Amino acid sequence: MNLHVIWAIVGMVLNVGVVLLAAPLFQGILRKITARIQSRQGPPIRQPYLDLLKLLGKEDIESGQTPAMQRFAAYLALASVLTAACLVPMGFRAPLNGAGDVILLIYLLTLCGICTLLAGLAAGSTYSLVGISREMMTMIALEPLFAIAIVVGAIHAHSFRLDSVLTGSVYSTARFPWSGALMLAVILLSFQAFVQRVPFDTSEAETELMEGPLMEYSGPKLALFKYASMAKLLVYSALFVAMFVPWGSGPSFFPGVGWLIFWAKVSVLVLLVTVVAATHARYRIDQAIRFFAGLLAVALVALVLATYGH
């Protein structure tokens, strides 16, 4: 085993460890800020850790007729997000840098949502089925935006390799293209939907559907789904910073300064998500789809501009 492989393994362990440890922390801070905005005391910041430990400590109840997808969907959902975390820089170079292309990243981040869909479908509850239908409509409208954003970056980098796209974004001194500016606006406006926060959490909608696809889940499997959702917020935030606002978070003269700047920007983005979620009402599914349709039109314009070098 050569040194490159050893460092890749160490980097993967560090990235996964950072996501697993920091995701509940960010969730706890998110809850606390939301409570303060709404003039409530709110739970302690450590509450997400306690909730996960409580769920993981419960008995995993299954019947003999439990479908295989219902048994393994939670594990696959969390695994897909953690694998994506190894492709995305977390303040330092991604441990699997160069091991995958943008198509793999799109696949991994979409797979988490697909696992939730299949898990809800296997449960068969009425509320689950309504949540699934909403989630499916949202994914059909939303995933093209993410794909176009990645492809626009790939066009400017002249490569579909993820490291080329992100490295080109971090170290490029060229002017910010019009297509990049448009996609920055599109992704920023739709970011709440990517991380399934208000006003676009129509598929779960606790007050309407009692968490929709996850209604029939409890114990360790529910903990894994919750963990995947928390981790997704962190991975998407890190990817957004690496692609669209990388300035200052690359290699620095002082070790660790770039890492601190990177996580400061991630924290600002999570704070923005929190403020929007705490101050907006949930959209109806038809309102959300119309909103995404408008963003898709702008994204297609950005794709055309990128094709012509703008």
Regions found by a protein language model. Name each.
Residues M1-H310:
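Alpha-helical transmembrane segments of multi-pass membrane proteins predominantly involved
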